[in-house]
């Protein structure tokens, strides 16, 4: 039913993702409901700032707390997705130590640290892949 609504209205949804970097590697997660790698993140709730949504999703999905000041906006993009327009802010944070990642095995079923050169060869959510490629170009 929602897909029919999306096809007719083409609403804009808002999301926030966080690329976690440590020791030259990036954390990729696999969600139970999509066939590709992504980063911790999700929908921005009505009235919520994207940065706060990113912080909330980090705790919910991988049990990690960082401060708002540690997040840097890496990429902001709007693209068609499942009959709607998805506006996504991708943040990144450089971690000094490798954190313990707690996967809930419901929404997030896998978390792996990989070199960015490897990440861009994997089936990664396209806007996220663009942010990783941008990071490589610096």
Predicted regions and their residues:
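NUDIX/MutT-family hydrolases
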Residues: 90-92, 102-132
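A short coil-to-beta-strand element that immediately follows conserved catalytic motifs
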Residues: 65-75
């Amino acid at each position: 039913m929602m897909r029919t609504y999306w096809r007719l209205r083409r609403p804009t949804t808002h999301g926030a993702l966080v690329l976690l970097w440590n020791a030259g590697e990036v954390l990729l997660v696999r969600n139970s409901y999509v066939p590709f790698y992504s980063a911790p993140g999700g929908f921005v709730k009505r009235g919520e700032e994207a940065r706060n949504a990113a912080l909330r999703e980090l705790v919910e999905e991988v049990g990690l707390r960082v401060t708002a000041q540690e997040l840097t906006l890496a990429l902001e993009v709007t693209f068609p997705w499942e009959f709607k327009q998805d506006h996504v802010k991708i943040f990144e944070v450089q971690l000094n130590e490798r954190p313990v990642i707690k996967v809930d095995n419901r929404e997030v079923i896998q978390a792996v640290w990989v070199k960015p050169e490897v990440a861009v060869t994997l089936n990664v959510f396209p806007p996220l892949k663009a942010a990783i490629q941008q990071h490589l170009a610096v």
